[in-house]
Structure formats: C-alpha cells, structure tokens
Amino acid sequence: MKILWLNSGLLLPLDKGGKLRTWHLMRHLALKHDITYLSFAERGQSHADRVGMREVCNALETVPRTDPAKGTLAFYADAAKHVVAPLPYAVGKYRSAEYAALVRKCLESGGFDVVVADFLPPVANLPRTLAIPSVLFTHNVEAEIWRRHAENASNPFSRALMTQQWNRMLRFERDALSRFDLVLAVSDADSQTFERLYPGALRRPIHVVQTGVDTSYFTPMPGKDRRAHLVFTGSMDWLPNEDGMLYFVRDILPRIRQAEPDVTLSIIGRAPTPAVKRLGEEHGIEVTGRVDDVRPHVAQGDVYIVPLRIGGGTRLKIFEAMSMAKAVVSTTVGAEGLPVTSGQDLVIADEPAQFADAVVNLIRDSSARRQIESAARQLVVEKYDWAAVAQDFEDALAAVRRGAAPVRLSA
C-alpha cells in the first residue's frame, strides 16, 4: 500500500506516548509499505530528527511552525486568540493554509491508496471529502479530556474556559469522526465512549488497535539500589501529567511519608513546568527533565506510580513499566482502557488514602511486590508485543482500502 500519514509534528524525539505508539506501528508498516509522512516541524528542529524519520517513512514533507513556549506572553496571547475562535484550541492552533495546500498537492499527485490522520489536528487541514479511503487514528477521546479538565479546574474562571473548550471539542470531534471511512481507537473503553457521545456519527463500527510495548527493549534491569523509591515518567508539559503530580505530592505523598519517612520520588520527563520544578525545590523530589533513556530511572523504583485524574486513550508508560517487571499503582483513569486486573497485574487505587496504602504495602511486602512484577511482565510479553499490534493495524488499513470492515482480534 501507498500510505499518506498526516500528523501535527515529527515523531522524534520519542518523548511522548502518542509519538511512541505511532513510531512502533509505522516502523512495522514501513517494512512492507510505502509511507509519506506529512507534518509540521518546529523551527530549529534538529537535522538528526528529520534524518531519523526515514526509519519509518519513505518520504517526509514538513511545514515550518513555532509553538510558543508554555507560560510565556506569546503563549497566553495565542491561547486568548483561540478563546473567540470557532475551533477548539487544541485543534485550531494547528490550522494552516500552507499545511492544507501541501495535503491537497499530495492527494492530487501521490497515487495514495489510503490516508491516515493521526490525532485530530490534521483534520482541520483536510478537504471535506476525500477521493481515497481515509482512516482517523485516535489516541484519546479528546472531549473526555476537556470534560475532566473542567471538572478538576481549580477556580470558576478556569472551569468556564475548560467547559467552553469541552463543548467545542464535542462538536469538532463528532464532525471529524463522521468524515472518515474508518476510526481506530486504542481501547475498548474509548470505542464505547465514542459510540456513547456520538451516536450515528460513524460510517462503520470503530476498530480497536490495542496498545503495545517493545518487550525486548523494556526488560527487567539489575542494579536497583534505592529502597522505598517511587518513579513517575511522562511529558511534564502535558496538563494531565502535571495535574497528577501536583495532586500526588499534595494529597498522597504526605500520607506515604507518615508510614515511610525515607520514601523518595523521581519525576522523569521532558519540559517540566514551573509548578513541577517547584516540587523539586520545595518537597525534595527529583525532577530530571528530559532524559535519553528512561529505563535506568524506572529500574531504580520499588513502585511505579500513575496518579492521573485526567486523561483518555491508554498509558503506554504503564505497559513499559510492566514490561520492566515493575509493580504499578494507578488510578482508574491512569489505567483506563488497559486490559489489566487490579491485584494481579497492578494495583488500582483512586482515593488518596487508598493510593498511599497500596504504595506502602508494596514497599514493605517484597513477596507481594514480586508477584505483581512477575505477572505484569508475563502479561505484556504474551499478548502485547508491538509486532502483533502492528499487524492488526495493517490489516485494518487493508480492509478499509477494500471497502470492508476490519476483523476484530480477540484480546
């Protein structure tokens, strides 16, 4: 197949869950298919990132773009502009006449068999109708993320803004789903939420492509020398991650420290916001920023924590930690959409006291911790290696090209 793949940015560096998911899928697809990848590229993006993209695509087309840094005057001015715009901010900021023109040029001259829109933003730059089969690859239910932002907003002004964005996203997401021949979701939970929110919008049933993990890369590592050490990984400029860490340090960590005074915490991930950096300064927490390899950091943890209150899709970080045989404690939202069993593969805990107790129990009970670690590793190795997930994705593209519905794989 000749595939036109649309995204809002380059996949490199591989520092976000959505980038990782797409990278692994494209890496397998590129072995047999011809992929043209079209996206924005940040001005100043390294030449190495562009060259590295050739591992997953045959051709790379980019449109230059600069995203204002979060917290700057330019960032707030850009956000304010979109308060009165009709599109939701998360989509509207990517609307571009230059991008749309490049898409039209590719569609008119490329002889493509199928077009894949990766996430929602590229949809804003697509023609209303397409002459070739089209697939929307969703990694989240975006409207649900904004609903949770609104519910967890700290003041009435923020709540009003988040509610406005939620309502705009509901309208845009419904319209986007209706425009594609096939919609792919990353979990049964997301599929069910789409069907509940947007009845009648879909051309055919949603196909679920499960989350995978590179089990040969994320393997158990020796050398742990820190007791009572907790680890969290993620892009720290993504609001759900920032909110989760602020919530954990405010409401959960003090309870853990009452029982385990020597407990330590590392927050590993790119672009920590000022609020996250203050956690390191005021609470004795290690905030690393971007690291080249998360594995040595994860390996040092007794417990891997995912205290998210906002989110959608699935958390690749959980499968990565499980693949490294780490005991995970997560909220229900954090583990949403993953085919895991609490008490067997990981521990689910939603209330602060419950979450703290689960962490303390795993720190103290090495036998229970090892049992969960072993079960976690076994689950992902047996069922969720990327090769099998990518084959399902490929089969779905081939089916929509033929005009057929993909065959659902059993979990």
Per-region residue spans from a language model:
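Acidic donor-binding loop of glycosyltransferase active sites
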Residues: 181, 284, 290, 299-313, ...
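Donor nucleotide-sugar binding/catalytic pocket of nucleotide-sugar-dependent glycosyltransferases
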Residues: 62, 135, 143, 162-166, ...
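N-terminal subdomain of nucleotide-sugar transferases
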Residues: 1-63, 108
